[in-house]
């Protein structure tokens, strides 16, 4: 993702990314994943695999104390390139703001969801929550995703028509597939140009509202509402721009946001939430600020999770007291493990794979062997892991059941003001929702 962002700014920035990959190759090769870690009173087994470029890049730039001459040199070079990157980003934005490069418009209400940092902030579950809410207001809504890591190539790809899935996770990409899985009645489209996929959604699905998933930097398209997500656990990364840090653009650019949505506020460190409020207000006096949390909703059998849109499972509370093996390949496994602990699950052990790891049949055989050895009642994985499990494994008869934990976003502080504003703006542009009762309850 980091390289993809830099690649959008052609020339010097693209060349810089190639140089950085070469420089980090030796560094990555020498690093090994930590073998054993412990959280609370649970044993944690970390697999002995080499993590990918993005994992080590994040580890490197977030080190608070840069040790050694070589690492200091790398950081100095990164900082130099980050200054170049900042100028390119500012130039590109200026060209759009002054009209030197024309923005395209869609004949519908456009909402952009995104962030100013590389990495996850909860865009996918937030897009799901927002799409459901708008649909319940009576508007036809579609989600436009760029198709990150998708094998599909073309102008417009239909992941879901709102009734059935049209692509698998490998073809559509993880994010788009997960969106489609949870959104009956909401088409999900992928394609590099949101104006193209947006027009298709309007013409073929009658879309009245288009949600741009990860669209904060997609300046090519006009939008009616810009929603900026900020992870309350990892606030603005380390404060530096790419490649010295994880900022996609300067913090001053949060002045574009109409809404600041803080995610995972229940897991935030002391002082993090006031800091986000203060930082946002220093650049943006008028935007709404909302706080949200991620809540576990249900556990779905892996085979059922793959079946079709909106697969059902058991309530999250029913897993309380059960002995489970947690398995994950995500950036923050401790958060996933803490969620299980908070639910009252007896997590006997947790197997951590590198972030974005693609599970092979050998990996899953190791997981099953470990589960049987420990005598657990279930294996629990995240939805991001579920899309990486091979199809043969999904269809196989497992002696220990595999469950996928499904998480949803819940808006808290600022919720009423946000939905009141959203309803007013939708009604002003589109009129009242026509397809369902106007006073539908918004969760």
Summary of predicted features, one role per range:
Residues 16, 21, 48-68, 235-375, ...:
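C-terminal accessory "lid"/substrate-recognition subdomains
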Residues 148-284, 291, 298:
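Phosphate/Mg2+-binding loops and adjacent switch elements
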Residues 84, 124, 179, 213, ...:
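Residue-level signal for inorganic ion chemistry
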Residues 49-108:
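A transmembrane-helix-recognition feature enriched in membrane-embedded lipid enzymes
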């Amino acid at each position: 993702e980091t390289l993809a962002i830099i690649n959008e700014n052609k020339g010097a920035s693209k060349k810089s990314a190639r140089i950085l990959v070469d420089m980090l190759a030796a560094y990555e090769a020498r690093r090994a994943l930590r073998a054993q870690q412990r959280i609370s009173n649970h044993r944690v087994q970390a697999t002995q695999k080499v993590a990918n470029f993005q994992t080590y890049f994040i580890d490197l730039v977030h080190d608070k104390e840069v040790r050694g001459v070589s690492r200091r040199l790398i950081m100095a070079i990164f900082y130099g390139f980050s200054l170049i990157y900042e100028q390119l980003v500012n130039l590109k934005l200026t060209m759009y703001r002054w009209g030197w490069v024309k923005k395209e418009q869609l004949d519908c209400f456009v909402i952009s969801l995104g962030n100013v940092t590389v990495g996850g902030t909860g865009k996918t579950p937030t897009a799901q929550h927002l799409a459901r809410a708008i649909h319940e207001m009576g508007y036809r809504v579609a989600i436009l995703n760029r198709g990150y890591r998708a094998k599909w190539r073309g102008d417009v790809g239909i992941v879901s028509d709102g009734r059935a899935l049209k692509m698998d996770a490998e073809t559509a990409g993880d994010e788009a597939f997960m969106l489609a899985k949870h959104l009956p009645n909401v088409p999900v489209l992928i394609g590099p140009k949101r104006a193209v996929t947006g027009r298709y959604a309007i013409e073929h699905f009658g879309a009245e509202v288009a949600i741009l998933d990860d669209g904060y930097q997609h300046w090519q398209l006009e939008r009616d509402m810009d929603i900026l997500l900020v992870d309350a656990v990892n606030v603005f990364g380390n404060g530096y721009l790419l490649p010295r840090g994880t900022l996609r653009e300067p913090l001053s650019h949060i002045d574009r946001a109409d809404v600041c949505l803080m995610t995972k506020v229940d897991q935030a460190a002391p002082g993090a939430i006031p800091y986000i409020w203060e930082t946002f207000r220093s650049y943006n006096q008028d935007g709404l600020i909302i706080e949200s949390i991620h809540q576990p909703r249900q556990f779905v059998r892996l085979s059922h999770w793959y079946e079709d849109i909106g697969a059902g499972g058991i309530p999250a509370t029913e897993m309380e007291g059960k002995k489970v093996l947690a398995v994950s390949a995500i950036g923050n496994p401790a958060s996933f493990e803490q969620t299980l602990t908070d639910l009252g699950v007896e997590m006997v052990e947790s197997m951590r794979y590198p972030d974005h790891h693609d599970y092979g049949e050998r990996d899953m055989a190791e997981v099953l062997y470990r589960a049987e050895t420990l005598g657990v009642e279930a294996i629990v994985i995240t939805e991001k892991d579920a899309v990486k499990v091979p199809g043969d494994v999904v269809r196989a008869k497992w002696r220990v059941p595999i469950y996928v934990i499904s998480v949803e976003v819940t808006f808290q502080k600022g919720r009423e003001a946000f939905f009141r504003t959203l309803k007013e703006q939708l009604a002003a542009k589109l009129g009242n929702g026509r397809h369902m009762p106007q006073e539908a309850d918004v969760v």
